């Protein structure tokens, strides 16, 4: 006869030896033995964890010897079931014997019993509220009549496995508060974002080696020409341009801020033995890759520092040339006049300055000529400065008036005549004389700020800068000093072939601010308006006419000699021919009290045509 229960239960098999007689079964002397066998299962190791038994005097286990006194099932927040079972006997002596018997039974009957020490064996056999339910406990009771009874109770066993229920609150707090190690970045945390592809190392994670890092730097535009560059790309030879910067990048990538080139150099020497890198003999900071990958991105090593240095050199040379020109063009003024004013324009291909923009003028006694080059030769835009200086003995106050003019191209159909007005407006009109002159209104507020109209004491000094109309790009020296040398011998000579026009008006009209020029007059050699000669004074002017000074260049012979000395090699015969011919122009200067015509032309020097 056999009885089989489920997998976690026990199998009780009674061996009868073939005796089926009721008399034989009822005889206590031949009562069959009880054989307890284990059914193989996953939880069989924990089957006898909480089994308790009581040894009776008649060596039989009765039901009354095993008593379950208390069972508690508590549901807490973690849905853990806590089962507390206390084994109680009739007296204290039986309790000790019961514990010893249970320990002996567990150590003997279990195939692989758990090791229990004395701390775990106490009156409360099962653990406290933090335990898990593992497997049911099977209580076997055999009465004197030979009828076995099976009773199952739930068992709770203390486990050491990591689980949310089994961990104590302190352990849970430790796990929650533990800081995770930040992942290693894929690229150095620097200004150049270098994307380096990670490679597996025997399937044990990702890492970037130093030689891979150097290859990544060589493929990055932000670092290749600046920190590291190829010297012989086909041979795999490269140079560390800035070894400190490369070592800092490698240190940031490895999270080592104290990385230097010596430490990185030891890693590079390790690659010599591996056959990855080689040191190029005779050259400092130059290495060679033994094997070059095929999918490299090559960057043209155009060193930006060279372009920066070249631009700095060009800028410094431009600044030096402008300083030299300024020193050459400095006007020598009278000893009593001090101070100065300078107008400086930035060199470069910038837009032409607007003639309406105000020019900064302080207390000028000398003005530095500045030239702004333009990309196209037409229209030629040149800035000139005109000084009207009064001698110190006539006026105690320092008086200097500066204005800038802009000349259009000589080949324009209609020459534009402009008067750029400063705070003290000096009307100066310059135009090519070989072309028609149209009507223009010249506003005049005050001619010279420091001159009293009622006083006519003292002669005037004029500094003029003119450009020949036939050569727009050839500029003569612009600082032409007109000085009064001898009262009886004026040095201004106007030949009949040159046409000059003088603005004639009365004093009141000029003071009111209106001056007009005849519309489109026909200029020729036979109809001059005002003619000067060496032996005669100013002629053909009615009373009340404002006397204006008309200035021309020097005579042809002297001008030719000056041009031949100072001209560049690129000035051909056309330039010399144009220099020989006197350049006619019309200039109008007016004052309320009139100017003396006894002035002399002083040509300082000629400017090189390509000086600006």
Swiss-Prot record:
Pfam families assigned to the protein according to its UniProt record, in alphabetical order: Elf-1_N, Ets
Assigned keywords, A-Z: Activator, DNA-binding, Nucleus, Phosphoprotein, Transcription, Transcription regulation
Residues annotated with Phosphoserine modification: 110, 163, 167-168, 187, 431
InterPro entries, A to Z: Ets_dom, ETS_fam, TF_Elf_N, WH-like_DNA-bd_sf, WH_DNA-bd_sf
GO CC term, one of those recorded: nucleus
UniProt-listed GO biological process terms: negative regulation of T cell receptor signaling pathway; positive regulation of transcription by RNA polymerase II; regulation of cytokine production
GO molecular function, one term: DNA-binding transcription activator activity, RNA polymerase II-specific
Compositional bias per record (Low complexity), positions renumbered to this chain: 305-322
Keyword set includes Nucleus: yes
S-S bridge residues: none
Subcellular location per the Swiss-Prot or TrEMBL entry: Nucleus
SMART domains, sorted: ETS (SM00413)
Domain of life: Eukaryota
Biased composition annotated in UniProt, kind: Basic residues: 172-182
Organs and tissues of expression: Predominantly found in hematopoietic cells. Detected in other cell types such as fibroblasts.
PROSITE patterns reported in the protein's UniProt record: ETS_DOMAIN_1, ETS_DOMAIN_2, ETS_DOMAIN_3
Composition bias type Basic and acidic residues, residue spans: 562-577
Region (Disordered): 156-199, 300-361, 562-586
Compositionally skewed regions (Polar residues) per UniProt: 156-169, 323-335
Homology family: Belongs to the ETS family.
Purpose: Transcription factor that activates the LYN and BLK promoters.
PANTHER family in alphabetical order: ETS, ETS-RELATED TRANSCRIPTION FACTOR ELF-1
Name assigned to this protein: ETS-related transcription factor Elf-1
Organism: Mus musculus (Mouse)
Organism classification: Eukaryota, Metazoa, Chordata, Craniata, Vertebrata
Gene name as annotated: Elf1
């Amino acid at each position: 006869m056999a009885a089989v229960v489920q997998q976690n239960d026990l199998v009780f098999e009674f061996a009868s030896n073939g005796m089926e007689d009721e008399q034989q079964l009822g005889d206590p002397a031949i009562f069959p033995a009880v054989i307890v066998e284990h059914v193989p299962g996953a939880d069989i190791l924990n089957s006898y964890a909480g089994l308790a038994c009581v040894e009776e005097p008649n060596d039989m286990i009765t039901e009354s010897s095993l008593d379950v006194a208390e069972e508690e099932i508590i549901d807490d927040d973690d849905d853990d079931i806590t089962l507390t079972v206390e084994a109680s006997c009739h007296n204290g002596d039986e309790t000790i014997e019961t514990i010893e018997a249970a320990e002996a039974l567990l150590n003997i009957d279990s195939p692989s019993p758990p090791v229990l020490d004395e701390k775990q064996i106490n009156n409360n056999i099962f653990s406290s509220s933090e335990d898990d339910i593992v497997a049911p406990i099977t209580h076997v009771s055999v009465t004197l009549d030979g009828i076995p009874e099976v009773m199952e109770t739930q068992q709770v066993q203390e486990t050491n496995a990591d689980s949310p229920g089994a961990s104590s609150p302190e352990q849970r707090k430790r796990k929650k508060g533990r800081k995770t190690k930040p992942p290693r970045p894929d690229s150095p945390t620097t200004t150049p974002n270098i994307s380096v592809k990670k490679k597996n190392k025997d399937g044990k994670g990702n890492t970037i080696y130093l030689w891979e890092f150097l290859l990544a730097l060589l493929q990055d535009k932000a670092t290749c020409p600046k920190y590291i560059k190829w010297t012989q790309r086909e041979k795999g030879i490269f140079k560390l341009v800035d070894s400190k910067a490369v070592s800092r990048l490698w240190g940031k990538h490895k999270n080592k801020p104290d990385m230097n080139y010596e430490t990185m150099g030891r890693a590079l020497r390790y690659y010599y033995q591996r056959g990855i890198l080689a040191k190029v003999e005779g050259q400092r900071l130059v290495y060679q890759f033994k094997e070059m990958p095929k999918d490299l991105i090559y960057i043209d090593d155009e060193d930006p520092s060279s372009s920066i240095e070249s631009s700095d050199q060009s800028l410094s040379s431009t600044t030096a040339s402008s300083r030299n020109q300024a020193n050459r063009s400095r006007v020598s003024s009278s000893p009593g006049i001090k101070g100065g004013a300078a107008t400086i324009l930035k060199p470069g291909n910038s837009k032409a300055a607007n003639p309406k923009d105000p020019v900064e003028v302080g207390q000028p006694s000398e003005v530095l000529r500045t030239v702004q080059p333009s990309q196209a030769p037409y229209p030629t835009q040149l800035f000139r400065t005109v000084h009207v200086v009064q001698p110190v003995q006539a006026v105690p106050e320092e008086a200097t008036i500066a204005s800038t003019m802009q000349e259009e191209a000589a080949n324009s159909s209609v020459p534009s005549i402009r008067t750029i007005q400063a705070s003290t407006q000096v009307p100066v009109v310059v135009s090519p004389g070989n072309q028609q002159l149209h009507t223009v209104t010249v506003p005049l507020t005050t001619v010279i700020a420091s001159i009293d109209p009622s006083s006519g004491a003292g002669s005037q000094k004029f500094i003029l800068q003119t450009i020949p109309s036939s050569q727009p790009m050839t500029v003569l020296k612009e600082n032409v000093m007109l000085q009064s040398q001898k009262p009886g011998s004026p040095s201004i000579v106007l030949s009949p072939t040159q046409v000059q026009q003088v603005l004639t008006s009365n004093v009141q009209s000029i003071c009111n601010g209106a001056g007009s020029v005849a519309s489109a007059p026909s200029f020729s050699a036979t109809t001059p308006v005002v003619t000067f000669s060496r032996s005669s004074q100013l002629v053909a002017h009615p009373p009340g006419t404002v006397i204006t000074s008309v200035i021309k260049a020097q005579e042809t012979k002297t001008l030719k000699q000056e041009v031949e000395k100072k001209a560049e090699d690129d000035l051909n015969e056309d330039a010399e021919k144009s220099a020989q011919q006197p350049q006619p122009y019309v200039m109008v200067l007016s004052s309320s009290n009139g100017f003396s015509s006894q002035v002399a032309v002083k040509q300082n020097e000629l400017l090189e045509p390509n000086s600006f």
